[in-house]
Amino acid sequence: MCSSDLLSLAGGMLVLVALAGCGIKSQQQPVKDYSGEPTGVEAPASSAGGASWAAWLDDGRQFGIVLYGSSTCAPTVASISVTGDNQLKGTLSPAPGGVCTRDYVPHTTVFTTPKGVTTTSDVTITLPDGTLTIPGLQG
């Protein structure tokens, strides 16, 4: 192999390594999942009627995402990925098979706040069915 071939190969490898760092960061799994709203947190007025919402928990060390649906087929967030500065993307767990009850109740999924997320600034969470914002914590 001549030196120009080696330089081309090295340049190509560098591009591949650089592109590998451009994708979505690793996914994070929930630490807790339960029926109901988080305790000690007031639901925003926008959640009246069953709109999804999110809030800081444990002084910002965690956050909860509240989704509404059937108590027997509860909607849950399967994972969260950091996609940018204070930008998160969530994936939903697949709906279970079978018959679901016709009630409409809150269900909370809790995650550890990812490294690099600034809790004193607003955080945007994009879910398949909409976008939620957690207001920054006041110092």
Question: Which residue stretches match the model-derived regions?
Answer:
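Sec-dependent signal peptide hydrophobic core
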Residues: 7-14
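Extracellular/mature segments of secreted proteins
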Residues: 30, 80-83, 108-109
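Short, small-residue-biased leader/transition segments that mark boundaries at the very start
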Residues: 1-3
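Mature extracytoplasmic domains of secretory-pathway proteins
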Residues: 53-99
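Post-signal peptide N-terminal segment of mature Sec-exported envelope proteins
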Residues: 30-50
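Extracytosolic low-complexity repeat regions of secreted or lipid-anchored proteins
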Residues: 89-139
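C-terminal motif of bacterial Sec signal peptides marking the signal peptidase cleavage site
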Residues: 17-21
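Bacterial signal peptide processing site
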Residues: 23-25
